[in-house]
């Protein structure tokens, strides 16, 4: 309760217009986000830095940093909210059947509105657990090649071009168009070459040709990163070329960070870092897996066994430089600053969205429209149907 009490005092401080009387530079809204993040991270101990690299982060009370949980979903409307009623849209595979870019952008915009309203209300009620945040691990832009894959309905189908086009509209709608603040944070997943089989996803080593990699599996990620400025990427469970995706030289360093110049944050899929040593058998233990993941640009460990908690020891033993930890923590705090989480509500354009947008008539009407649009009639020209026994 003590951290909640302190957090409430911070909210009162900001809401009463006293935010200009800052104690630290990172609280000064006149500075650039980059300078504010640099100042904040410079004040953290190594233990505090590492604590911010798991999906459920604790408060840093001495600096007034509230707790935050990164995990959330909005594949077709805000997901997994038990105590709020939200608008549910067709599954992405149905959205793809509409071929309607405007409808998908509007759906994502409406979803961000509902997510913002929930976040503001949950914050007032001191709800800091999973699925109340503004970092949505959506869209799923994997390629649906095999109908036996049980999560294919989360995708926009088998076409790399269409997936990229619709994925961009999703990001545009969700993140908004404010030059400073994100309406919500989108995250392109699962990077990369992740299209089943589901049962062995934690240990499967994908083998595809270089042509297929670039022609089929990477185009949508390229489009969302270089054109739509998606703020997050989730690295996948599987391995590619014998190395787990979250610690893969080609995917994470050469392509994502260097060729595409991605500056956002990367989260692991939940438990993917533990898979390095448990199932892929590419690393001997937790600490080596955690170090390798961070060195390859994975910033956030979606918790299972919380592999990243070993990073404090790794720094003290000289296995990784603290500067590499700083890079990841700065990327993470940059997202939170871009979401306006450290600014007075009256400075952030999305903080006044009311709860009555949840399941509003406008949103429900659009969901119905998209459902109608998604119905596809196959031409039965040669009387293929009904199937003969």
Task: Give the location of each predicted region.
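Glycoside hydrolase catalytic-domain context in secreted enzymes
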Residues: 17-389
């Amino acid at each position: 309760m003590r951290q909640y009490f302190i957090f409430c005092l911070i909210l009162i401080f900001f809401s009463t217009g006293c935010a200009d009387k800052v104690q630290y530079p990172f609280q000064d809204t006149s500075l650039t986000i980059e300078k504010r993040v640099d100042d904040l991270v410079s004040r953290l101990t190594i233990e505090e830095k590492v604590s911010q690299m798991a999906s459920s982060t604790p408060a840093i009370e001495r600096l007034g940093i509230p707790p935050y949980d990164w995990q959330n979903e909005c594949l077709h409307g805000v997901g997994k909210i038990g105590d709020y009623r939200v608008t549910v849209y067709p599954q992405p595979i149905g959205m793809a059947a509409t071929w309607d870019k405007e409808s998908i952008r509007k759906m994502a915009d409406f979803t961000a509105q509902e997510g913002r309203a929930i976040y503001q209300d949950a914050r007032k009620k001191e709800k800091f657990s999973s699925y109340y945040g503004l970092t949505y691990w959506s869209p799923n832009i994997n390629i649906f090649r095999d109908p036996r894959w049980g999560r294919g309905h989360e995708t926009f189908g088998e076409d790399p071009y269409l997936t990229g086009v619709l994925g961009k509209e999703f990001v545009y709608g969700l993140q908004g168009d404010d030059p400073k603040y994100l309406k919500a944070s989108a995250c392109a997943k699962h990077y990369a070459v992740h299209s089943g089989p589901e049962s062995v996803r934690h240990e499967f080593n994908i083998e595809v040709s270089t042509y297929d990699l670039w022609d089929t599996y990477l185009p949508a990620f390229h489009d969302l990163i270089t054109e739509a400025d998606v703020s997050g990427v989730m690295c996948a469970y599987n391995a590619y070329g014998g190395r787990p995706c979250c610690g893969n030289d080609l995917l994470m360093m050469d392509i994502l960070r260097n060729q595409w110049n991605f500056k956002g944050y990367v989260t692991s899929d939940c438990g993917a870092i533990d898979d390095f040593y448990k199932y892929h058998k590419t690393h001997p233990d937790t600490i080596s897996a955690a170090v390798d993941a961070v060195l390859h640009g994975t910033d956030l460990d979606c918790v299972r066994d919380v592999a990243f908690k070993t990073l404090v020891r790794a720094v003290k033993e000289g296995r990784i430089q603290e500067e590499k930890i700083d890079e990841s923590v700065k990327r993470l705090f940059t997202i939170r600053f871009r979401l306006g989480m450290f600014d007075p509500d009256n400075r952030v354009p999305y903080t006044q969205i009311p709860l009555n947008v949840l399941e509003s008539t406008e949103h429900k009407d659009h969901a119905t429209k998209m459902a109608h649009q998604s119905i596809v009639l196959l031409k039965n020209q040669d009387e293929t149907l009904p199937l003969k026994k």
